[in-house]
């Protein structure tokens, strides 16, 4: 599944920002605009026992250029909240449910 970082009209958002995937399906986050973005999973809003640091980008790492990607595969079923750390205050947050 591909998730865009930044909408086509320049909005600071994940597109889609609420979605489901089967366990083990790769999710590819792709920078869609010229803004620096990243993908960080909220350690308090992921299934118990999942290490947020193993599925998140480092807060200092950024996808700076359009077309740059970050891929993650989630296997533990449940709900995961994630955000872009530079733009979390602007509402750039999302949720994925692993079935």
UniProtKB/Swiss-Prot annotation:
What InterPro entries does UniProt report for this protein, alphabetically? BlueCu_1 (IPR000923), BlueCu_1_BS (IPR028871), Copper_blue_Plastocyanin (IPR001235), Cupredoxin (IPR008972), Plastocyanin (IPR002387)
Q: Which cofactor does it need?
A: Cu(2+)
Q: Where is each Plastocyanin-like domain found?
A: 1-99
Write out the GO cellular component annotations. chloroplast thylakoid lumen; chloroplast thylakoid membrane
Annotated keywords: Chloroplast, Copper, Electron transport, Membrane, Metal-binding, Plastid, Thylakoid, Transport
Membrane topology recorded in Swiss-Prot or TrEMBL: Peripheral membrane protein
Q: What is its main location?
A: plastid
For binding Cu cation, which residues are annotated in this chain's numbering? 37, 84, 87, 92
Q: Which Pfam families match?
A: Copper-bind (PF00127)
Subcellular localization: Plastid, Chloroplast thylakoid membrane
Q: Does the keyword Thylakoid apply?
A: yes
UniProt cross-references to SUPFAM superfamilies, sorted A to Z = Cupredoxins
List the Gene Ontology MF annotations in alphabetical order: copper ion binding; electron transporter, transferring electrons from cytochrome b6/f complex of photosystem II activity
Of which family is this protein a member?
Answer: Belongs to the plastocyanin family.
The function of this protein is: Participates in electron transfer between P700 and the cytochrome b6-f complex in photosystem I.
State what protein this is by name. Plastocyanin
Gene name in the database record: PETE
């Amino acid at each position: 599944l591909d998730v865009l970082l930044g909408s086509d009209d320049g909005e600071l958002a994940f597109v889609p920002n609420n979605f489901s995937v089967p366990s083990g399906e790769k999710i590819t986050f792709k920078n869609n605009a010229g803004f620096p973005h990243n993908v960080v999973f909220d350690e308090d809003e992921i299934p118990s026992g999942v290490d947020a640091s193993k599925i998140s980008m480092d807060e200092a790492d950024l996808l700076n250029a359009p077309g740059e990607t970050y891929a993650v595969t989630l296997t533990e079923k449940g709900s995961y909240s994630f955000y872009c750390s530079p733009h979390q205050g602007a509402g750039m947050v999302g949720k994925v449910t692993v079935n």
